[in-house]
Amino acid sequence: QVLEQLPPGALGTMLTAQLKTHQGAQRKYAIKQVECIDQHQAKVALKEATDLLKLHHSNICTYKELFVTWNNQVSSLFLCLVMQHSGQGDLSALIEEKRQKSEKIRDKVVQKFLGQMVDALFYIHKQNIWHRNLKPSNILVTGEASFMLSDFSTEALMKDELKWKIRVEEESKSWMAPETFGFSFTEKSDIWSLGCVLLDMMSC
């Protein structure tokens, strides 16, 4: 059951869904839908995204399922990524809240954030996986000083030039490494983005 559809971003639409188990329990999930330009891109993106199912880290959002679906209304293929849902929002909302209240994020929280994100990035980089879209809205807040990386992007979809241009025009360019404007991604791109996010946190 779909509970909510969030405003679409340059690289997809995010849904909040609820699944009822046989025992009657209700679990919330986030589902990201990304449009694919053709069947080949969908296959490549799905193959890339399967690596996300193998990630098991306390500071990385758990991916539950991946599938490709056809939307008759727009006659297009969509890659769907089902992931863990955090009821506490994301880092972007936390930063905005602090700014509205003219409050600072405590140094201890910032230090824990940095340690958790460095550890999470080191974990994915060892497996030759890059995040490619690291920014505050893609970092989930799971506790007072607990955070999770979320919303990874696949290379196949990030190289869709039309979506890329839209993304560059949005605020996310504030966290993008210089080389990513030329469609190049490495582990250094993620580190650059993390530094920008850290600066954003400290400038509340």
Q: Where are each of the predicted segments found?
A:
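Catalytic-loop of the protein kinase fold
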Residues: 125-141
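Conserved activation segment of eukaryotic-like protein kinases, specifically the C-terminal portion
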Residues: 165-179
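Short beta-strand micro-motifs within the conserved protein kinase catalytic domain, predominantly
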Residues: 62-77
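Conserved catalytic-loop aspartate of Hanks-type protein kinases
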Residues: 190
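Conserved short submotifs of the Hanks-type protein kinase catalytic core
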Residues: 74-90
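Activation segment signature within eukaryotic-like protein kinase domains
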Residues: 113-114
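Glycine-rich ATP phosphate-binding loop
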Residues: 13-36
